[in-house]
Amino acid sequence: MNLLVKCAGKIPALALTWTCRP
């Protein structure tokens, strides 16, 4: 999904926090 890509390029949003791994 593009969620991971957005996380890597942009700041992880509250909704994407679960999908984004620090």
From Swiss-Prot:
Induction: Expressed in both exponential and stationary phase in rich medium (at protein level). It comes from the Bacteria. This is Protein YncP. It comes from Escherichia coli (strain K12). The lineage of its organism: Bacteria, Pseudomonadati, Pseudomonadota, Gammaproteobacteria, Enterobacterales.
